[in-house]
């Protein structure tokens, strides 16, 4: 990244995004932070995002937007909970106090309010506040990215798409990072099933910058949702050198690559990608995206009857420290997969009991408000499935299958729960569940024709119960 490309105080003001600091260095470091966030790539020449934020704080400790970016990125990463992490909670308080001690723009005050609101767990209101910023400042990348990620956690697919659609015309080709905004739009199109348009927009973004890993990610998703394995595998292999340097997303793109192999039934190839890329990057970063990818990959392989050895216990070294976080139900379910896979009954019990305790007084925390009708039934379903109580697992999951969207994540990520439900129904001794399995598989085959995984499940369903792990 060339320092000359980074905006100083006047450039931010000219863009209609005035920053309350007199330091040109701080303004450029803030721009560098946003650039790395948008491109999913830490620039080592700048010290990465953490290095930029640290230098901002050292240069102008009263620069509120520096605190907004630092706290917002921690919170949006969902790897730390201000409810249990006192250092993070204090950092949010410091930001709030600073915002009251100086004259800020309305836009900056809304940013502070949005981060405070997200910290309190009120994700829908936080998204609304970021949208208020975008109504008057459509090129505010921090507000756009935070809203985009927030909608992703909420399972609000249309909002995730439309939030970008409303501002995209304001991002001219000469606007810094405009092609990456187009990549964000491609993902929203994908998640609302506009696959052809998603591919078109993603490829337009990649024509500008072939290292745009988020647009690569969109293309990977489209091939996954269409079960177009040959195209997906070819695309991954042909573009790997372009995106593998995106240290914040490469693990997830490798996860998508491994999904193609699981779909094909080539489990050794999937395990090789796991051992060579997915696991090492997770242990290096510890980020939640990488953690849930690891849990999901091992669980999917286990569903296919693959012995994953000690890999669960290795992953537990990371997940166990997050048992009390309860930032997202989506995360909690993946922590649970790791405790079940490791046969750690104490962690399973602690995770579920602490979740249920929070459901008693959720307050404004949107995720805690979902525990009783989504979090607890899904946790119980995974536990019952693990115990071989397939009928109970199916009965817990089937009534809420269309509500599972509310835990967030992508269609590809949540498909794991579809697979668990189908396998539970197949393996149940109940004729009702076996018939349900046939119905669900017919539905799946219609939606994703030519899926080898679906065909394997159809054959197992025809063979009768008792043949799944």
Swiss-Prot record:
Q: Where are the TPR repeats?
A: 107-140, 179-212, 251-284
Q: Which UniProt keywords apply?
A: Repeat, TPR repeat
Q: TM segments?
A: none
Please name the InterPro entries in this protein's record. Answer: TPR-like_helical_dom_sf, TTC38
Asked if the keyword Acyltransferase belongs to this entry, the reply reads no
User: Repeat among the record's keywords?
Assistant: yes
Family assignment?
Belongs to the TTC38 family.
Name of protein? Tetratricopeptide repeat protein 38
Organism per entry: Xenopus tropicalis
Q: What is the lineage of its organism?
A: Eukaryota, Metazoa, Chordata, Craniata, Vertebrata
Gene that this polypeptide is encoded by: ttc38
